[in-house]
Amino acid sequence: MAGLMKLGCLVFVFVIAAGPITAKAALSCGEVNSNLKPCTGYLTNGGITSPGPQCCNGVRKLNGMVLTTLDRRQACRCIKNAARNVGPGLNADRAAGIPRRCGIKIPYSTQIRFNTKCNTYIC
């Protein structure tokens, strides 16, 4: 569980980007999960030693999809649920390093943790 609590430093830091507020989030958990699924092997301490191009492309695509506050909050909820499903095999250190390893520039380092209140903390 401690490894999962480190989710904040995870991959998913990059989904928090500035954007205008709209009335309804257009982002679904299916979209979030499908974009991050290629990262699973890397994040679960398998034999994969780098995120790989499919993982990096998925992260870039997701980063470009979270345009509104509601989208970012929805992505936060989806990411927290997905990380719970991965379970204790999740490597938080690898997750935290994905933006750097993929060459993705993050404007700031908002962290998503299991105790993050996605509806109020993520703007």
Swiss-Prot record:
A Pfam cross-reference name: Tryp_alpha_amyl
Residues making up the signal peptide according to the UniProt record: 1-25
Tree of life domain: Eukaryota
InterPro entries: Bifun_inhib/LTP/seed_sf, Bifunc_inhib/LTP/seed_store, Plant_nsLTP
Keywords: Disulfide bond, Lipid-binding, Signal, Transport
Disulfide bond annotation, renumbered to this chain: 29-78, 39-55, 56-102, 76-118
UniProt record, GO biological process: lipid transport
Molecular-function annotations in GO: lipid binding
Similarity comment: family membership: Belongs to the plant LTP family.
Function: Plant non-specific lipid-transfer proteins transfer phospholipids as well as galactolipids across membranes. May play a role in wax or cutin deposition in the cell walls of expanding epidermal cells and certain secretory tissues.
Protein name: Non-specific lipid-transfer protein 7
Annotated source species: Arabidopsis thaliana
